[in-house]
Each structure stands twice: as structure tokens, then as C-alpha cells.
Swiss-Prot record:
Signal peptide: none annotated. Monomer. It comes from Orientia tsutsugamushi (strain Boryong). Binds 1 dipyrromethane group covalently. InterPro entries: HemC, Porphobilin_deaminase_N, Porphobilinogen_deaminase_C, Porphobilinogen_deaminase_C_sf. Keywords: Porphyrin biosynthesis, Transferase. Its EC number is 2.5.1.61. Gene3D superfamilies: Periplasmic binding protein-like II (3.40.190.10), Porphobilinogen deaminase, C-terminal domain (3.30.160.40). It comes from the Bacteria. It is an enzyme of class 2 (transferase). It catalyses: 4 porphobilinogen + H2O = hydroxymethylbilane + 4 NH4(+). This is Porphobilinogen deaminase.
Length: 298
């Protein structure tokens, strides 16, 4: 039996898809192959995502292939997966999560606070932008689209003073993160919802594929992302809303989660920490979002 695995065609996406293929082949004894698919998000590099349709542009063509049965599963970076999926599709599994953090990539500074006054920092993420400006209002934030390789090369070529990249992506691409790279503490920058996790999407009614996905699902990662996605779904924020969060296991079937919600124009910035049992994680994430909504409408 051949399992057709749909993926974006970028180097990082294909590495992540290969990790899923390896799980399918090794654990299930099946033959999985990768079908690379060009997405709109990959093709349009000169505009902010929120001006052209959001992160869903990295999924649109892949999900179309899934709905039309030209692939059997789709592999995504979970942080790119919107709160709500097209009818007929659902998240079927996640692999064990990688590093959840963001890294400051800069030749001239090891920490955000060490950047010179008015330093130019490239990012297209509104989440990263607002957290950078909360810490350093003097920074000059400029649009910085492109895959990891493109953004890394812009640092090498001194086009900007710094950028921020997901640690998991750099590690999966085998970058030497001892050069120019330093983890940003969560006290300064919370990651995107789902950051570091590789997600598998499938057709809800596929009675063959769904059980296979369950067999390679990493249960603890799955439970923790329910907390984060409960928060995300309740806010139903698009990619022009600065939103972040991370749920971490703390033992005894319990988790701790940190959430942030901001405004692009810096009119407000909310932060909260919650704890609870994993079996109640989704509902606790929902409640955290509702508490922010209440503060907005007081």
C-alpha cells in the first residue's frame, strides 16, 4: 500500500514530510511517498501575509489536493494551521514536538536588549513584531518574507541587523545555531500557537488513513496542543492579530500554559499564565481566551 504525503515544496517542509514518511514506513511497515505542492504563500514573497489571505495560503493548494483525493495526508508546520479547517478535513496526528522557542539571529547582538538603538530587525510576523516593540520600542521593524534559507542569507549579507526564526526550523535544517543564534527567553517572546510541532491533516471520513495516523500520533504533544488550539479557536484570530502561546508538561498529568494577545497598533497587550490537568486542557485554553475577550470589552 502506498500512502501519498502532500507537502509544501520548501526544503524545511520536505524535511518535515520526510520525518512523517519515516514514521509511516518504520512503524507501520507501509510505503509512503512525498508529493511536493507549490502553495500561494510560497509564490508571493513581497507582501505581508495578512494582506494576501493569511497563513492559510501555505495550506490552500495542499488541502485542495487532499479533498480531491490526489494525496492521502498533508503535512504542515502546526503553527501555520489556522484555527478552523475546511469541511471534511481534520488534524489527525502530530509528531513529537521539537524546540518551541524563537531565536534571535544577529551578527551584532546576542540578546534583544543588546541591539543598538534603532536597529533594523526583519520579520513578517505580527506576533514577533509586537513582542520586540514591547521590549524595545526604538527598533525599526521591516518586512522580511521568504523561507528560512532566504532570511538566513539576508543576515549573512548584512541586509538587516537581526531577525527572529523558529529554533525548530533551524535545527531541522541543520544550521549551526552556535553562529549568530541565541534562544529568546519566553519572558521576552512567546512562540506561535503550535510552534515546533509537525501536524498531519487527513480526510475525516477516511476509515483507512485516520486509524493509521492515530498509530504515529505523539500523545503528550497532542494533549498539549489541544490547550493552545482551544485558545486559538476561541479567539479565531487571523494573522494580523498578534497572538502567541505555549503549553508545557509539568508532571503529574498537568500542564502550565502562557498566552499573549496584542494589538498591531500597540493599543493593548495581554498576558496570562494558567495551569491544569491535561484532560481539561482544551477547555482551559478556551477559558484563557475568553478572559482576554472580557478585558477587551470592559
Amino acid at each position: 500500500m502506498i500512502i501519498r504525503v502532500g507537502s509544501r515544496a520548501s526544503r524545511l517542509a520536505l524535511i518535515q514530510a520526510q520525518a512523517v514518511v519515516q514514521k509511516i514506513n518504520d512503524l507501520l511497515g507501509l510505503n509512503a511517498i512525498i508529493i511536493p505542492i507549490k502553495t500561494t504563500g510560497d509564490l508571493i514573497q513581497n507582501k505581508n501575509l495578512y494582506d494576501i489571505g493569511g497563513k492559510g495560503l501555505f495550506l490552500k493548494e495542499i488541502e485542495y489536493a487532499l479533498l480531491n483525493n490526489t494525496i492521502d495526508i498533508a503535512v504542515h508546520s502546526l503553527k501555520d494551521v489556522p484555527a478552523y479547517l475546511p469541511d471534511g478535513l481534520q488534524l489527525a496526528a502530530v509528531l513529537e514536538r521539537g524546540d518551541v522557542g524563537d531565536m534571535l539571529v544577529s551578527k551584532i547582538a546576542n540578546k534583544i536588549t543588546d541591539l543598538p538603538l534603532g536597529a533594523i530587525v526583519g520579520t513578517s510576523s505580527v506576533r514577533r513584531r509586537i513582542q520586540l516593540l514591547m521590549l524595545r520600542p526604538d527598533l525599526n521593524i521591516v518586512l522580511f518574507r521568504g523561507n528560512v534559507d532566504t532570511r538566513w542569507n539576508k543576515i549573512i549579507n548584512n541586509e538587516v541587523d537581526a531577525t527572529v526564526l523558529a529554533a525548530a526550523g533551524l535545527q531541522r535544517l541543520n544550521y549551526d545555531t552556535s553562529r549568530f543564534c541565541n534562544i529568546i527567553p519566553q519572558s521576552e517572546m512567546l512562540p506561535a500557537i503550535g510552534q515546533g510541532a509537525i501536524a498531519i491533516e487527513a480526510r475525516k471520513d477516511d476509515k483507512l488513513i485516520m486509524p493509521l495516523c492515530a498509530k504515529i500520533n505523539h500523545q503528550l504533544t497532542w494533549q498539549l496542543i489541544q490547550v493552545e488550539r482551544g485558545y486559538l479557536k476561541t479567539l479565531n484570530a487571523d494573522c494580523n492579530v498578534p497572538i502567541g502561546g505555549i503549553a508545557s508538561y509539568i508532571g503529574n498529568n498537568s500542564f502550565e500554559a502562557k498566552f499573549m494577545l496584542g494589538d498591531y497598533n500597540m493599543r493593548y497587550f495581554f498576558y496570562s499564565e494558567v495551569r491544569g490537568k491535561l484532560q481539561h486542557g482544551y477547555d482551559i485554553g478556551v477559558e484563557a481566551a475568553k478572559n482576554f475577550q472580557k478585558r477587551l470589552f470592559i
